[in-house]
């Protein structure tokens, strides 16, 4: 009886944790920086939602970069990258993914529904800059949302930072980092909930299955000390991608903002990659 009671308590606790993990992360973003003139966006999505963001035009012919933040964040997480890229002449678009920041959305879906925001933003950028090349930088959830979005036409270059290949493994990594071997029990309970909460199958949340279909040069980056998306998983994602591709494993970095962690090496790697494939 005690064993059954313990199992019931564990299931209830896992259900409550699952509720917290998939809750929307709505929060006010506020006005754009006063010293950086941008257009404020409110874009309809093909999922009957609204995506909010900012767009700043760069120099003609330099191309554009769409920036996609990680989970439980918003466009402000990509602001430093956006300003750096804009200084180099790129047009930049940064959005709040669905269920984040000021965008609509009832549940965080770990990439699938967030893909609607990617499609809306890409369509807007291409409409604003006809004939120019467009790159995407996606961190963690943002990169997964791009891979799961099946956006067409697709980007001309892609930077994926700390992107999980498979949601089940991503859950296990995060749970195991906090409670060790108990993840053997808790991970299956959390993974079991996702289809019930989000009306999808776990097989739909495997970005690794879609990286080969990008059809664009890709730079894949992650920290060598990342316990959420391990170096082995990052290499699996890299191996699944088509050429041309590049891999950057950042010494000493965990699952962190790689630009904040190593700004100069980041600029060297990412700007070199974008300049090469956007024809800057």
Question: Where would I find each of the regions flagged by the language model?
Answer:
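Conserved alpha/beta-hydrolase "acid-adjacent" motif
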Residues: 227-233
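Catalytic nucleophile-loop/oxyanion-hole region of alpha/beta-hydrolase
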Residues: 100-129, 133
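An N-terminal hydrophobic leader/cap segment in hydrolases
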Residues: 2-44, 51-54
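Catalytic histidine-centered segment of alpha/beta-hydrolase-like enzymes
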Residues: 253-267
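Short beta-strand/loop motif that positions the catalytic acidic residue
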Residues: 213-215, 220-222, 226
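Conserved alpha/beta-hydrolase
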Residues: 82-104
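Catalytic histidine neighborhood in serine/cysteine hydrolases
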Residues: 238-256
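Hydrolase active-site cap/lid region
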Residues: 148-203
């Amino acid at each position: 009886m005690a064993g059954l009671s313990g199992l019931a308590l564990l299931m209830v606790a896992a259900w409550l944790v699952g509720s917290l993990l998939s809750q929307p992360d709505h929060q006010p973003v506020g006005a754009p920086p006063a010293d950086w003139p941008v257009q404020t966006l409110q874009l309809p999505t093909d999922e009957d939602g609204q995506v909010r963001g900012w767009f700043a035009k760069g120099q003609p012919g330099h191309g554009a970069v769409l920036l996609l933040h990680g989970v439980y964040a918003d466009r402000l997480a990509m602001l430093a990258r956006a300003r750096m890229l804009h200084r180099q002449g790129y047009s930049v678009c940064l959005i709040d993914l669905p269920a984040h920041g000021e965008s609509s959305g009832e549940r965080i879906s770990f990439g699938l529904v967030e893909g609607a925001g990617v499609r809306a933003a890409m369509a807007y950028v291409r409409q604003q800059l006809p004939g120019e090349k467009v790159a995407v930088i996606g961190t963690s959830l943002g990169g997964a949302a791009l891979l799961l979005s099946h956006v067409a036409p697709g980007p001309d270059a892609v930077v994926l930072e700390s992107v999980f290949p498979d949601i089940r493994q991503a859950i296990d990594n995060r749970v195991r980092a906090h409670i060790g071997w108990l993840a053997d029990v808790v991970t299956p309970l959390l993974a079991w909930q996702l289809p019930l909460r989000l009306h999808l199958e776990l097989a739909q949340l495997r970005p690794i299955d879609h990286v080969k279909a990008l059809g664009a040069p890709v730079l894949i980056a992650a920290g060598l000390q990342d316990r959420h998306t391990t170096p082995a998983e990052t290499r699996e994602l890299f191996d699944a991608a088509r050429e041309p591709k590049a891999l950057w494993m950042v010494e000493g970095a965990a699952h962190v903002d790689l630009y904040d962690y190593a700004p100069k090496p980041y600029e060297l790697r990412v700007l070199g990659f974008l300049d090469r494939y956007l024809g800057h």
